[in-house]
A protein has these predicted regions:
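Short Gly/charged-rich anion-binding patches and loops
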Residues: 6, 81, 156
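Predominantly a Rossmann-like dinucleotide-binding segment in NAD(P)-dependent oxidoreductases
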Residues: 16-19, 24-122
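Loop/helix-junction capping segments adjacent to catalytic residues or to phosphate/diphosphate-binding pockets
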Residues: 1, 27, 152
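Hydrophobic residues in well-ordered beta-strands that form the structural core
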Residues: 1, 18-20, 49, 143, ...
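Rossmann-fold NAD(P)-binding glycine/threonine-rich loop
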Residues: 1-17
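Contiguous beta-strand/loop segments that form the cofactor/metal-binding neighborhood of enzyme cores
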Residues: 84-179
Length: 181
């Protein structure tokens, strides 16, 4: 926290903008979809799903599996990027409530995946986390994130939006309507 404050203070003193790496905000797909949402193309968005899932993708290097040093698992490593992209496209609606459940089922059992090996005996972060964010405008956002989850795909990184006029996905950006039948 102290280093983050120093970085912020330095940026202010130099008249610079300090950006924490939420790089998906600046992707062309994100910018274009945000513009369409702002222009009402999707109508009232009532369900959003942000997914950052890995089947067997526990990072086997660094401190990713150490809760004391890392602070958490897939939510703060990969899930936060899809959550930020979703919130950015939605225009950061006011949050009414948050409910989440985390699980530690796989990382403590085995130690080999697409990103190397780790020590199951010292694995202390969640394998997966699932949450619901309810907004004051009545909409909800479902968040799904995992380092290790028994799913078919090796990786799913996407955000979907369901509005009363159209739906959309973010990576790549597609809008789905019934305008032409």
């Amino acid at each position: 926290p102290e280093q983050a404050r120093e970085m912020c203070d330095t940026a202010r003193k130099l008249g610079k903008v300090l950006a924490y790496d939420f790089h998906h905000r600046f992707a062309l797909d994100t910018q274009q979809l945000r513009e369409q949402v702002t222009n009402g193309v999707l109508g009232e968005i009532y369900v959003t799903t942000a997914r950052a899932l890995r089947r067997c993708g526990v990072p086997g290097w660094g401190v990713f599996t150490n809760k004391e040093l890392q602070g958490g698992g897939p939510l703060i490593d990969i899930g936060i990027h899809m959550l930020d992209a979703a919130m950015y496209v939605l225009g950061f609606p006011a949050v009414k409530s948050v409910n989440a459940h985390s699980f530690q089922k796989i990382g403590t059992q085995k130690s080999c995946g697409q990103f190397g090996e780790w020590d199951p005996a010292t694995y202390s972060v969640e394998d997966s986390l699932f949450g619901t964010i309810e907004f004051h405008n009545g909409g909800i956002l479902w968040l799904e994130t995992s380092f290790a989850l028994n799913i078919r795909e090796q990786s799913i990184m996407n955000v979907s939006f369901c509005g009363d006029k159209a739906g959309a996905t973010l990576f790549p950006a597609h809008i789905y309507t019934d305008n032409n039948g």
